[in-house]
Amino acid sequence: MTSSSRPHPHRSLLLVFLGVFAGSIAFSLAGMALLRVAPAAAGRFGSLLPWFMKVPTWAYMLSLPALVFVLYLPRFGGRRSVLLLLWGSFVGMMAELIGTGTGYPFGPYAYTAFLDPKILGHVPYVIPLSWYAVSVITLDLASRLRRPAAVRLVLAALFMVLWDVALDPAMGVGFPVWEWKVDGFFYSMPAINWAGWFVTSLVIVLGYEYLGGVEFRETT
């Protein structure tokens, strides 16, 4: 039996995180549809409205890394799974802390209070976990193209940039998760942001490759 045909050993846990992940998206979409069709409905929720926005956002951002960790656990094994989690989160955290403090490598920006609390008062705790989760997925996608290692890593970093192309308008404009301090060319985003995403992502996936990559390894 091949690794892809085996039942997932943590199927129940995987389904729980998948349910939370999908449910948070469905709840958010339903809420946005309601407010678009009946904007006056927002007034009925009063002070609870921000929580109806924050809770599904937190559920989404916490369930995504949990889902990725459990999904890939049989492939990576416990030790490599933890190392990938720590490395991706650490690099993402450091890049964000440096970025919010200096304006490099992403450009001048700051996180709002929407995802409080924050690490050192600058970066929401869930953000580094998102770097880990999405970078594992993009490296896996790039690896499936069966290209040389250097091409695979560059593709993974480019996939991360494409993720940000879709993410930034939603999180920087649609939801007030962060604010740009400049008037950039793309939803206020400066061009340096994509360069910063590429470099940060490349550092993350290079570390993943050093730690064994994302390929399945048969264990005894």
Task: Annotate each predicted stretch with a short phrase.
Residues 2-220:
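Aromatic-rich, lipid-facing transmembrane alpha helices and their immediate juxtamembrane interface loops
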